Amino acid sequence: MSEIRKPLLGFVHKLQDANASGSSGKTHCPTCLRLFKVPRLLPCLHTVCTTCLEKLDPFSVVDIRGGDSDTSSEGSVFQDPELCSLQPQIGILCPVCDAQVDLPLGGVKALTVDHLAMNDVLLENLRGEGQGLVCDLCSDREVEKRCQTCKANLCHFCCQAHRRQKKTTYHTMVDLKDLKGYSQVGKPILCPSHPAEELRLFCELCDRPVCRDCVVGEHREHPYDFTSNVIHKHGDSVRELLRDTQPHVEALEDALAQIKSVNNALQERVEAVAADVRTFSEGYIKAIEEHRDKLLQQLDDIRIQRETALQLQKAQLEQLLADMRTGVEFTEHLLTSGSDLEILITKGVVVERLRKLNKVEYSARPGVNHKICFSPQEKAGQCQGYEVYGAINTQEVDPAQCVLQGEDLHRAREKQTASFTLFCKDASGQSMGRGGDNVHVEVVPKDKKDSPIRTVVQDNKDGSYRVSYTPKEPGIYTVWVCIREQHVQGSPFNVTVRRKHRPHPGVFHCCTFCSSGGQKAARCACGGTMPGGYLGCGHGHKGHPGRPHWSCCGKFIEKSECSFTSGQGAPRSLLRTVAL
């Protein structure tokens, strides 16, 4: 059953009016305010008289759908499957919560009858000395007694006739005044397909109550059992849904309390900042007064903007809380006050409603905060030719706009301090220009996630933060950089930690001949040689790389790590060159 809401702020007033009705909502129609007459249960679990529902204007023709559409009403357990063909979908608005209700193919009269409400109405009439109750048999005279066996209300004449009949001679008759202490005096619920038969059985295949004639006809060969035998299984499933729904009520109440707290803090902060603005503006006469008024207007705009956001979230959560409460209260009332058959009849629409409520997503945190501050030393331009100071600061860091930079961002050495810089920016990409943000950094080895490395975050007070750490072992590390529990741009990322830097044991030279002083036995890792018995390289000779290089490994970069390994089997003359 799909539901479409009208604007939420308009719903809040209707919701308050509906809640103000109190306990009379169990016996009185919310539309006509009279005792229920043939009450129908809507998918939103609100009950309205059949006649009142029929007077409502159709909301719209929604679409063309088949019987398996999720917008079709499952309110009536007696809906004919053959009617589930393509037909126009008509909707009405619930007069209590403004939810759009897609009517079943049979219209309003195909909605589920709220037998629980009918029982409450009957009890209400009994407590009022039976005024307004007419005989169930003749429908002409006022009720005097009730047959506990037939569950029928009878006038004096029909009561005497009831006793004279052989089949009903020994039925128990009770005066209406003796029924005032009863909590349930409902009438027998008859099968709509076989009005002479009472619904006492439950078809497991069709998931609906049936009578004796149904199980030998339409439901022949379907598994069925007495309602008293299956109520435990189906009642437990409804109770499980109820238990899943109840925590949402508490969560929504806590969320509304937080919104109220934030709203109060916002008001206090606005007043405090306004006081600062007024104090600062006293020394500047007209120019400062004009500047003050501009600041107050800006502050008020911020207040209105944030209050509107809070009120909208508050209205949404209040509406959702009302829906949750309606579902919980109705289900609790059904499970505690309803008969086995009443629970089974109403089970379908209750289960559908509770499932949908449990799937609704909502944020338990306020959508805005009360962070507003006044910066009196900040330049605000000129006002009437005067240089004025003071500005309202609502700038907040946006983790998605923050930037990570540094040579050691993706590489590091074991037992050597590595560092990088975090530049904080707001949503527009502007630098924060100030510190104080809650920056959280974690450096964790990929193969030892339970052993994070100690990190140091230095606040530079200009919107940038220097992060440093010292890895103890080589390997792949994962770095997390978060602000307000949100990853910054590029986080998380991996860092490759190499072994400690290996210095060059050789010399950085132009050639072996020059660095060794002309020794013939001196060699070089570049592999160059010279004629005349020289084993090392020389300018312009075979194998010389043409530029300065390291004699130990042949690398061309002076500030680099030596790649020479003992397994290369370097000749002794190479080491002699190193010594020279």
Swiss-Prot record:
One of its GO terms (molecular function) is ubiquitin protein ligase activity. Disulfide bonds: none annotated. A zinc finger (RING-type) spans 29-98. The keyword Coiled coil applies. A zinc finger (B box-type) spans 130-176, 186-227. GO terms for biological process: bone development; negative regulation of inflammatory response; proteasome-mediated ubiquitin-dependent protein catabolic process; protein K48-linked ubiquitination. It is an enzyme of class 2 (transferase). Disruption phenotype: Deletion mutant mice show earlier onset of death and exhibit higher mortality in response to lethal challenge with LPS. The production of TNF-alpha, IL-6, and IL-1beta is also significantly up-regulated after TLR challenge. The keyword Cell inner membrane does not apply. Its EC number is 2.3.2.27. SMART domains: BBC, BBOX, IG_FLMN, RING. It catalyses: S-ubiquitinyl-[E2 ubiquitin-conjugating enzyme]-L-cysteine + [acceptor protein]-L-lysine = [E2 ubiquitin-conjugating enzyme]-L-cysteine + N(6)-ubiquitinyl-[acceptor protein]-L-lysine. Filamin repeats lie at residues 394-497. Zn(2+) 1 binds at residues 135, 138, 158, 162. E3 ubiquitin-protein ligase that plays a role in the regulation of inflammatory response. Mechanistically, mediates the 'Lys-48'-linked polyubiquitination of TAB2, a regulatory protein of the kinase TAK1, leading to its degradation via the proteasomal pathway and inhibition of the TLR-mediated inflammatory immune response. May act as a transcriptional repressor in mitogen-activated protein kinase signaling pathway. This is E3 ubiquitin-protein ligase TRIM45. It comes from Mus musculus (Mouse). The lineage of its organism: Eukaryota, Metazoa, Chordata, Craniata, Vertebrata.
